[in-house]
Design a protein with these regions (language model features):
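Single conserved hydrophobic/aromatic residue that forms the stacking wall/gate
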Residues: 1-13
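Short acidic-aromatic active-site loops that bind/stabilize oxyanions
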Residues: 2, 47-51, 189
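A structure-centric signal for secondary-structure junctions around beta-strands
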Residues: 9, 32-35, 91, 217
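S-adenosylmethionine/decaboxylated-SAM
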Residues: 52-234
Length: 234
């Protein structure tokens, strides 16, 4: 019998993953009551919001980085924007972009309910069109939009990110599809799969970024922009 440490390790992790996540989430001290309400409403309406593990990690990053200006791509119903406004230790300004018309009024109402409407600015429309129009820099950017568009947003995102700033991208592992062969991925998901792989390669190989890919939730990347000579960025 092969008793090598690597044999069956993936199966062990797979079996234990759900129990581990449940245990880790049980240690969470929770959010404010309004965030709990908005989260439950989103879940009841099948609106995707950041997972519990990601919520904890985002709060940790905010406590460490204390960003003054935050850009979010992908508002949904405003849950993560409100969470960042609530748990950033400094009085930050948040700009968030949303393209789905049905969710925009819900997000606006949620900002008012949370008392964050003056702190959060919602830009309505396609991020691909809005990002090029932005000129002020940000010290924290959270990407949680259409996964197949991350690679297309990247040039403007990096232009807007301050040196020393943090870029967080959510849902980058695609429920494990990212490690599969191209042919093992369902045909309708192959374009997203290809683009996400390109995005992850760019994040981890650019000289002006230091990036970690972490198995938090459905996978996240955390990148810091560093100063390099112009001809060394690629």
């Amino acid at each position: 019998r092969d008793r090598s440490p690597s044999r069956g390790l993936g199966d062990v992790y797979k079996r234990q993953d759900e129990r581990l996540v449940t245990y880790i989430n049980s240690l969470d001290t929770g959010n404010t009551s309004i965030l709990d309400q908005i989260e439950q409403e989103a879940l009841d309406s099948y609106v995707p919001i950041i997972r519990k593990e990601m919520q904890q990690f985002l709060k940790l990053l905010l406590a460490m980085k204390r960003p003054m200006r935050i850009l979010e791509v992908g508002t949904a119903v405003g849950f993560s924007a409100i969470l960042m406004a609530e748990y950033d230790p400094v009085p930050c300004e948040i700009t968030t972009i949303e393209n789905y018309e049905k969710r925009i009024p819900i997000a606006k109402e949620n900002f008012i309910r949370a008392g964050k409407e003056k702190q959060i600015t919602l830009l309505e429309g396609d991020a691909a069109q809005i990002l090029p129009t932005l000129t002020e820099s940000y010290d924290f950017i959270f990407m949680d939009a259409a996964k197949g568009q991350y690679i297309h947003f990247m040039p403007d995102i990096l232009r807007l990110l301050k040196t020393g700033g943090t870029l967080v991208s959510d849902n980058v592992l695609q429920d494990g599809d990212i490690i599969e062969s191209h042919y093992a991925v369902i045909r309708r998901n192959r374009t997203i799969y290809k683009r996400m792989r390109e995005y992850l390669y760019e994040l981890t190989h650019r000289k002006d970024l230091v990036t970690a890919v972490l198995p938090v939730g459905d996978g996240i990347t955390v990148s810091t922009k560093v100063e390099v000579e112009n001809d060394e960025k690629e």
